[in-house]
């Protein structure tokens, strides 16, 4: 389905996501061989399967996790060493927070139960670096092109939205792990950092991967999780911005300055109320340089695949054209006006309506774009609108317009 519907439009990857606690199939070094025990085939099979169809495989996993199956088996050794994997984690640690079952060990999560709760690597133990870097290289050998590393905030300080849920490993150890991963990845696999605190404007994360999340999970989808929830609020921990809209505005220039891609999480167009909301979601992610991560399924997408297939908009991604908001203050109305520029000099002007009421928009080209007049093309209507000195429209609730302006001297 993906190969037929989306590969012709430039989509290049299928990535796994989410819960891996039901996967206990490991190799002799403790590395997972598949996403779930019910899977018949391993990572390499699916990577090769996708490659034959013009796609790459992305995998959701954190190399600092250790499967309980590896801890139980003393013969599972860190690759290239005689060190049992069970010796590179703290088995005696007892978390005194929410841990009703009194599970022992430095665990990723405590409510899951003894047999399913993953362990964290102890970076100060012999073999830890070899294990983490070996995991990254293992995925490379499986022809995996993209590694989606989740729950980084939980490792750094054990905090989730201001609440303690696990052990605080410290920012120094967190940074050390990211450096190990970066070194092992080289230019052979793309690293995506998920659920980072991004403390001090991302001082630990920038340079450690190609991409990082800037908002909470898309969850149940819809406009609320894309734009409305906690609108105008900013936090000093994960996630500093709740929604994709807030995150893309706030982090736009900071990420660009560090040559890193903003990840706004998945899109499920089937959860939006109408096509206007869908077009706004796709437009914003494209102009901001975020990946279009389709999480609709073949049996849920209904008649909205065409919104992912707008070739005039997708061309902006192929040309690596970034747009930026006039203001990175999410409370400022100018944050809904974005401007980008092609190498040929053409201007991409995008305007959004985040509100539930119709909104009048008027933009004077001379004042905002520093040009007197321009030929205007609407990239959703696929129509030339003629020469204009300003643009005036009534935006529908949650709607947008994306225009290409060719300046006239």
Across the structure, where does each feature detected by a protein language model lie?
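Aromatic-lined carbohydrate-binding/catalytic grooves of carbohydrate-active enzymes
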Residues: 1-133, 137, 144-146, 151-165
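Structural recognition of the beta-strand scaffold that forms the well-ordered cores
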Residues: 12-17, 57-61, 146-150, 190-193, ...
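Aromatic-lined carbohydrate-recognition surfaces of secreted/lumenal glycan-active proteins
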Residues: 56-70, 174, 178-202
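Glycan-recognition surfaces
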Residues: 102-103, 123-124, 184-299
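Active-site and adjacent substrate-binding regions of carbohydrate-active enzymes
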Residues: 130-183, 193-196, 253, 259-284
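Carbohydrate-binding surface patches
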Residues: 279-281, 285-288, 293-295, 330-370, ...
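Solvent-exposed beta-hairpin/edge-strand motifs
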Residues: 366-382
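C-terminal beta-strand-rich structural cap/linker in extracellular carbohydrate-active enzymes
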Residues: 387-409
């Amino acid at each position: 389905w993906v190969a037929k519907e989306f590969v012709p439009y430039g989509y290049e990857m299928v990535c796994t996501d989410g819960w891996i606690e039901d996967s206990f199939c490991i190799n002799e070094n403790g590395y997972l061989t598949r996403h779930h025990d019910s899977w018949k085939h391993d990572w390499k099979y699916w990577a090769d399967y996708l490659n034959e169809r013009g796609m790459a495989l992305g995998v959701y996993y954190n190399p600092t996790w250790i499967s309980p199956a590896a801890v139980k088996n003393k013969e599972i050794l860190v690759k290239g060493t005689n060190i049992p994997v069970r010796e590179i984690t703290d088995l005696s640690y007892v978390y005194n927070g929410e841990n009703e079952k009194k599970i022992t060990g430095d665990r990723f999560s405590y409510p899951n139960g003894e047999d399913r709760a993953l362990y964290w690597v102890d970076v100060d133990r012999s073999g830890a670096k070899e294990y983490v870097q070996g995991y990254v290289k293992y995925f490379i050998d499986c022809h995996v092109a993209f590694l989606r590393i989740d729950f980084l905030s939980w490792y750094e300080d054990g905090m989730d939205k201001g609440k303690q849920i696990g052990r605080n490993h410290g920012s120094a150890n967190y940074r050390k792990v990211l450096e190990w991963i970066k070194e092992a990845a080289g230019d052979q696999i793309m690293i995506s950092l998920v659920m980072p605190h991004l403390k001090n404007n991302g001082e630990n994360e920038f340079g450690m991967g190609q991409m990082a999340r800037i908002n909470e999970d898309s969850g149940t989808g819809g406009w609320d999780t894309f734009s409305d929830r906690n609108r105008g609020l900013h936090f000093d921990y994960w996630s500093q911005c709740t929604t994709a809209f807030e995150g893309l505005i706030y982090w736009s220039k900071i990420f660009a300055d560090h040559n890193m891609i903003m990840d706004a999480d998945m899109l499920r167009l089937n959860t939006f109320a109408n096509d206007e909301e869908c077009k706004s979601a796709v437009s914003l992610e494209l102009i901001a340089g975020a990946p279009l991560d389709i999480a609709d399924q073949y049996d849920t997408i209904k008649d909205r695949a065409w919104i992912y297939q707008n070739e005039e908009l997708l061309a902006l991604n192929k040309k690596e054209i970034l747009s930026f908001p006039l203001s990175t203050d999410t409370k400022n109305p100018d944050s809904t006006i974005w401007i980008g520029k092609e190498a040929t000099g053409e201007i991409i002007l995008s305007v959004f309506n985040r509100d539930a009421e119709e909104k009048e928009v008027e933009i004077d080209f001379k004042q905002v774009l520093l040009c007197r007049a321009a030929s205007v093309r609407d990239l959703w209507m696929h129509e030339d609108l003629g020469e204009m000195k300003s643009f005036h429209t009534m935006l529908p609730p949650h709607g947008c317009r994306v225009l290409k302006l060719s300046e006239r001297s």
